[in-house]
Amino acid sequence: MSEMVILDTHIWFWFINGSFERFPAQWLEQIRQADIVAVSAISCYEIALAHNKGRLEIHIPVQDWLTDSLAPAGIELLPLTPEITVRAVNLYPIHKDPFDRLIIATVLEYGAKLASVDSLFSKYPELESYLM
């Protein structure tokens, strides 16, 4: 079975922009060695929203950044499916952010490893074996 790593939105942004010091050093090797590196479609929305609100500096049009930061960068885009959305709704409400709940549900649906520095993710017992 191939290993998939799903990047939380901030990890994806840092990875693409070469800000490797922002996450644990061993993750870079795990990400590079994974058979599939992916992001949830909701991460595109989070990037565009953060950029639109001035919380994220991107020096090219955000649409170009998103396009360049997916397939050309070796990152697979995972869709939001009915199963993922229902699973996100049914998660215990530890994390109030619906975007993060959708990322958690995506990880669980795909059985993938999750790269995130969000401390709330570790409070989900069902994520225990999926966190990097």
Regions found by a protein language model. Give the residues of each.
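Short, well-structured N-terminal submotif of metal-dependent ribonuclease cores
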Residues: 1-39, 53-68, 110, 124
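Acidic, PIN/NYN-like endoribonuclease modules and their adjacent C-terminal/linker elements
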Residues: 2-4, 104-132
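Generic structural signal for small/hydrophobic residues in well-ordered secondary structure
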Residues: 8-9, 47, 88, 107
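A secondary-structure boundary/capping signal
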Residues: 8-9, 43, 117
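A generic structural signal for short hydrophobic patches within well-formed alpha-helices
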Residues: 12, 44, 85, 121-122
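Acidic catalytic patch
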Residues: 66-93
